[in-house]
Amino acid sequence: MASAGTEHYSIGLRRGNSFKQRHPSGTVSASPSEKPSEVKVWSQAHQQVKPIWKLEKKHVGTLSAGLGTSFLGVPSQPAYFLCPSTLCSSGTTAVIAGHSNPCYLQSLPNLFSNTLLYRRTNVRQKPYQQLESFCLRSSPSEKRSFSLPQKGLPVSVTANKATSSTVFPMAQPMATSPTDPYLSLAAAGENPSRKSLASAISGKIASPLSYKPMLNNNSFMRPNSTKVPLSQATDGLKPVSSPKIQPVSWHHSGGTGDCVPQPGDHKVPQNIATVLDDVTAPITPSIPSTLNISTASVTSSQCSQSNFRMEAHPCGLDENPDSQSATKEVHFTEAVRKLAEKGLEKMPRQGYQFEQACFVNPSFQWGLLNRSRRWKPLMGQRFPQEDIGLDSAILPGTSDTLGLDSTVFCTKRISIHLLASHVHGLNPSPACGSAVDPQVLGEDRAPVPPSSLQPLGVAEVATRLSSVHLDQPGKEPEEAKDLNSCTKGGGSATDLQPNQVEPEDTEDELGDGLEDSCSHDENEEEEGDSECSSLSVVSPSESVALISRNCVDLMSKSLPNHEKVVRPALIYSLFPNVTPTIYFGTRDERVEKLPWEQRRLLRWKMSTVTPNIVKQTIGRSHFKISKRNDDWLGCWGHHMKSPGFRSIREHQKLNHFPGSFQIGRKDRLWRNLSRMQSRFGKKEFSFFPQSFILPQDSKLLRKAWESSSRQKWIVKPPASARGIGIQVIHKWSQLPKRRPLLVQRYLHKPYLISGSKFDLRIYVYVTSYDPLRIYLFSDGLVRFASCKYSPSMKSLSNKFMHLTNYSVNKKNTEYQANADETACQGHKWALKALWNYLSQKGINSDAIWEKIKDVVVKTIISSEPYVTNLLKLYVRRPYSCHELFGFDIMLDENLKPWVLEVNISPSLHSNSPLDISIKGQMIRDLLNLAGFVLPNMEDIISSSSSPSSSSGSSTSLPSSPRDKCQMTPEHFTAQKMKKAYYLTQKIPDQDFYASVLDVLTPDDVRVLVEMEDEFSRRGQFERIFPSRISSRYLRFFEQPRYFNILTTQWEQKYHGNKLKGVDLLRNWCYKGFHTGIVSDSAPLWSLPTSLMTTSKGDGTPNSASKSRKKSASEGTTLSSEDRSTPKSKKSQAGLSPISRKTLSSRSNENTSKQSKRSTPGLPVLKYSGQSSRLSAASASQSVTDSRLTAVSS
């Protein structure tokens, strides 16, 4: 990277000028030039001003101390270097302003004849930011020395007829995130005469590989699809070519600060220049209607030994027609690209805002962009500061609550034609007053009320920057009429109650290291076109049109905010006294906000692999990002080692199960399925091609290889994804040696459509392993190979023919995308489109779907013993785990489904309307199905204060809900006896298992309530286990599970009449039975009477169960289904003599306890930090009644 004369240039400050310092009270006092202190101030400042490319923090401290305490209150933001233009008069005033205590410099000396002032602080803000709209942001910054980019154009600020100052953001590209390219853009160029300054913007923007593209439906994501008209101004900007800047070096001239151009290798940075002209001052929160933007550039003719001149020349749209054709694409400089690739450390977030000045810096512009954020007066508001003790007042409309680092881009590489619009100010006077208005800064000025503030929206200003078409300035597209549909619909993550500041400062918009590249655990498989990996295959020439077509078109169809359907923030249970769950909406829905005490609990833990589509969905439900480990509710991230699950609290959910790699790794999957084949026969488990794991099975593979000489084999790394390392071979010599591999028989006769092979991506969601609950999403993806299939051995090396992975075939020039989810075209279809296609061919697609369900259930069951044991060992509560699997299934010529592999992290990358439609709906339904619950605040505190569970203990962790149940010892013992009784029968039959529903325990009711509530939230998911036919799968479990027996029998009994089953459970929940509140009317399960009285073994388990069922049903069926309150004698009709004796002996001492439990008062339901007593006539009850019809469907 070229330097700029670092060793030969110094800066000095001329005496005779003075500072205006702002006191903590907010007033501005002028320091006359005749004051003796003025000499001392300038003398100290002169000693401390150093070359701007070598400045360090220590220089700033001394300079700040010399200039007064006003400098110490400026928070860290992108640094600006201010110096006056040569056009400046003695009245020139420059402003360095941040969030607090701006410094005003009056009567600065000429530009290069004396000074260039640099100011930098190390205070870092942690702004609250909206989650839904972000994609890219720098990680928490670290300090590093300045590096100068190769090219840059200086930014000049000129106040018309009044003031002039110059701002050089020379270090800004390095000091801020690489995601701030918009903020470093401005207009620069030259006219045909080369004597005045041009008015076009040109440059380059790059997207470092560590950043990921994002789908977002705000207008930043629509640079090509939206055409925003210029405002009703008569003059504006013209695009012209960039100026040619002669190389110079700045030579040290005896400490005077004079700049002498010298020939050499050092080049003046071509920074982008922007001049604001005719701006009303001071800048108020009202929307100005005019901003005349012109440009300033540096040319060789303006360089001299004593002065380096800069001139500003406003240029209108009608002045130079030849210049309009010279617009160029904007790209990053090579220096920035190299820095991004090397992964250099990032500077702290820095920046200054201009309060009441003519120049609006990018940080202030970005603050104005946030329409979704409520604009509040921040006068006197305190901000956390790390290194200073001064808290300063902030004027309304000047607070950059979002910061520069939250710039949003949906791009692999974006080319932008940028034009700043020309807007008229509300102030009728065209003149711009002094850059500093003492009346505005005076302490007697009242803050502007929020109602009078009208900041520009994020979409509105962003579109003006990125989407203006010069050739059609007068057209107003329909898309531009509603530019903030995403940001408003998603809600703001920073909306607070009036006059309330959020107490937590430990959250951030992105988790640690979100920008890092995807990593893979040795025991996991990160599959698909991940958000991180997609950058590597994009050519630099891809433009906005491609990005807009691939990932924005569908998002732009989102309804305007006022047309969106308003949804409640919580989904109420079908049952009384059951905690509601959080609702996740679609992009056409607007989710209501919870009260502050509940909304403050909505925290999400971000990961480097959290898909953008998940971020958008949780953002619409007003989640924020937390860096703490104890307050977040959900996380979508990497799989981790099983002992790591100990750290998950009882109120938290992670999108993985421990041990799920048993089917996620290809070698483990084969081991488990081959074990099932040996136990139950190949007829039941013949849906996975025969495989061999090398090097262990090398001898078996050699034997199979020799027996079928014409067989094709496919070689796969056991833990790879996206088609990496896969090859098709037919010779033994082609087999890779000395590394783990899975060698699998190749399905050489696949079912073809239009001559091409294809596979199905099926989305399988497991909410629980014990009891096992499996859901299948009704839609999916059909992925075609981009070359027609040929069985010839000569074509085995053609991956476009034999592999169907999208990440492989998208590199083929013949690959055709499909934007229509209903069309059978291109190389990617919707699964429902395939079923329609096959139905038109006379094929029974329902039969294929049923076969797919069968293989999915069997595959999940093959991993069940491992996962269940690890859950009991390392997970505190079953609630804490859930997982989405991606099954890759291929149909052979007989339409038999074959499982190729299972992905534990299926790709959710959405680069087409088809992906957005299917995956977006699937994620929304999945999160609703997961049942996120707002915890009690005391539960969070207790879990965080409890000793760490990551110790070496190997004992099972407790399950919170069960431990909190307050049951009598009799019911607790009876519950255990019932589970043991149904698990110890060696030859169970259907009648025996059916008796499990005769007497329900509190645990039974709780599990069944969870299952029915979950089913009512299923959306487009279909539950395939338990189901009415799932009893046939019970024999495949390595060990019988009591709750699997219970849920299967429940489905068999009530699948045709769900309302009856739900009504039965509602009756128990009304009494609080599922929470352990047991009244005297509740039946108590006991061993069958025949089993207790038969001591000689003449009774069988089956006969005993039948006799027990006959006796027990008399008391329990009536009490549950008829909703009557049975007598205590009747409730004991089915009990054994021992149980009756036990109950009678303790009846006296339990009378008082039972009377308290049976009081008519309803139990208190606690959730989200508040307590509410439910009643039968509550509002949630009406919601429950309206959803009962959905349960029966």
UniProtKB/Swiss-Prot annotation:
Which residues are marked as site: Essential for specifying initiation versus elongation step of the polyglutamylase activity?
R722
According to the UniProt entry, which residue ranges have a biased composition of type Basic and acidic residues?
A: 472-482
Q: Where does Mg(2+) 1 bind?
A: D888, E901
Q: Where is the composition biased (Low complexity)?
A: 943-960, 1168-1182
Cofactor(s) for this protein? Mg(2+)
List the molecular function annotations (GO) for this entry.
ATP binding; metal ion binding; protein-glutamic acid ligase activity; protein-glutamic acid ligase activity, initiating; tubulin binding; tubulin-glutamic acid ligase activity
Which positions bear Phosphoserine? S686
GO CC terms in record: 9+0 non-motile cilium; ciliary basal body; cytoplasm; microtubule
Question: Do you know which InterPro entries this protein is assigned to?
Answer: TTL/TTLL_fam
Q: Where does ATP bind?
A: K716, R722, G723, Q744, R745, Y746, L747, K757, F758, D759, T804, N805
Give every TTL domain span: 599-942
Disruption-associated phenotype: Knockout mice show hypoglutamylation of KLF4 resulting in KLF4 proteasome-mediated degradation in early-stage embryos and impaired early embryonic development.
- Enzyme category, top tier: ligase
- Tell me which EC number(s) this protein carries: 6.3.2.-
- Localization, UniProt: Cytoplasm; Cell projection, Cilium; Cytoplasm, Cytoskeleton, Cilium basal body
UniProt region (Disordered), positions on chain: 1-37, 468-535, 943-966, 1092-1193
Q: Where is this region: c-MTBD region?
A: 913-1027
Domain remarks: The flexible c-MTBD (cationic microtubule binding domain) region mediates binding to microtubules. It is positively charged and becomes ordered when bound to microtubules: it interacts with a negatively charged patch on tubulin. The presence of positive charges in the c-MTBD region is essential for proper binding. Arg-722 is the main determinant for regioselectivity, which segregates between initiases and elongases in all tubulin--tyrosine ligase family. A glutamine residue at this position is found in elongases TTLL6, TTLL9, TTLL11, TTLL13, TTLL10 and favors glutamate-chain elongation, whereas an arginine residue is found in initiases TTLL2, TTLL4, TTLL5, TTLL3, TTLL8 and favors initiation.
What family does the entry list? Belongs to the tubulin--tyrosine ligase family.
UniProt function note:
Monoglutamylase which modifies both tubulin and non-tubulin proteins, adding a single glutamate on the gamma-carboxyl group of specific glutamate residues of target proteins. Involved in the side-chain initiation step of the polyglutamylation reaction but not in the elongation step. Preferentially modifies beta-tail tubulin over the alpha-tubulin. Monoglutamylates nucleosome assembly proteins NAP1L1 and NAP1L4. Monoglutamylates nucleotidyltransferase CGAS, leading to inhibition of CGAS catalytic activity, thereby preventing antiviral defense function.
What's the protein called, per UniProt? Tubulin monoglutamylase TTLL4
Q: Which organism is it from?
A: Mus musculus (Mouse)
